[in-house]
Amino acid sequence: MSSLCLQRLQEERKKWRKDHPFGFYAKPVKKADGSMDLQKWEAGIPGKEGTNWAGGVYPITVEYPNEYPSKPPKVKFPAGFYHPNVYPSGTICLSILNEDQDWRPAITLKQIVLGVQDLLDSPNPNSPAQEPAWRSFSRNKAEYDKKVLLQAKQYSK
């Protein structure tokens, strides 16, 4: 890990511990030897109140490359997560996570998790990553909503 990457991730952790959005969690993963792996985090994103996603806390992994913050982290839900902008592998398709689109080195973990939370209830139909969820969202909203509610129940605490 480059010193710039390490320095930035230490700063991110410090900022997150001081100030993070209510209902969210994020922490570096512990390695087998008990030390922290600052390049891999586990986080949870609550569904917004008043949406079909409410009641669930959705787990993600955030993996930072050695080139961070020049390159964005890879952010993933569990494989098979049902959403039009999530690949079957769980990888999230979001412009702020794409270095060829809106990624900027100043983007923080807090901005990333808030962006993912917004994406849950406001999918981008022009950037489909998963055919079944995209098709339901585009053509059969009632079926889509039913599947989202089932998933919210699956991830409720």
UniProtKB/Swiss-Prot annotation:
The modification N-acetylserine is found at residue 2. The active site is at residue 93. The keyword Flavoprotein does not apply. It is found in: Nucleus. One of its GO terms (molecular function) is SUMO transferase activity. GO terms for cellular component: condensed nuclear chromosome; nucleus. Its EC number is 2.3.2.-. Pathway: Protein modification; protein sumoylation. InterPro entries: Ub_conjugating_enzyme, UBQ-conjugat_E2_core, UBQ-conjugating_AS, UBQ-conjugating_enzyme/RWD. Gene3D superfamilies: Ubiquitin Conjugating Enzyme. Its main location: nucleus. GO terms for biological process: cell division; mitotic spindle elongation; protein sumoylation. Residues 4-157 form the UBC core domain. Keywords: Acetylation, ATP-binding, Cell cycle, Cell division, Mitosis, Nucleotide-binding, Nucleus, Transferase, Ubl conjugation pathway. E2 ubiquitin-like--protein ligase mediating SUMO/Smt3 attachment to septins and PCNA. Seems to be involved in degradation of S- (CLB5) and M-phase cyclins (CLB2). PANTHER family: UBIQUITIN-CONJUGATING ENZYME E2. Interacts with SIZ1. Belongs to the ubiquitin-conjugating enzyme family. Present with 2600 molecules/cell in log phase SD medium. This is SUMO-conjugating enzyme UBC9.
